């Protein structure tokens, strides 16, 4: 579980020298979550909390239940047991639309962009929940609908500047390198102005330089926007560098929950990562 060679994305001071980061109240709470598919238990009695402003990593071998956990949080899956509370509100009846409307944004392990559309247009799809004009008013593109479109496009331009993708704003995303497509997907999630951001393997398939860039953007989103982040990532160097807290799943069970240093030396975690994948 040592940091990956060449990965030093965080500009935070070394842990020994850095002041302890302070977090707000609990914004997301999962209690005794259980999820199964037929006879297979994907998640088995898992509980944890996420605090406002925190970067929480969920790690574990393949098949440990990490993506299933994110799917429960944003309403793709309905747990058979347990409760999920977001900002004091029960999510028992949560669905993806309601989750997005409530301030939960998500990126996916496999890129889910509109490949024939430009970077700008893909980012604009992340603003649809913010637009109040109806379909016909938007088609006419006049008056309030036009003003709303211009205001939302101006906001998207700030995202483009933040992610340093000005040069590809008009490029169809299907023509972009993989690393830039991942950055556009992050931008679309940020366009929703989420209070909590779920990132499913945001650096999968990236080279060292691309991982450094993505790590920097994740840290900046957290520090500049105050966005709470829950991420799944297999690169342990990145996880240990940018996370405030790490949860480890194995065969659907939580086997560790603590700071990166605490998790790094946990024998159960070491044993899980030395074992075979569970796929």
For each feature predicted by the language model, list its residue ranges.
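Glycine-rich phosphate-binding loops of nucleotide-dependent enzymes
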Residues: 4-279
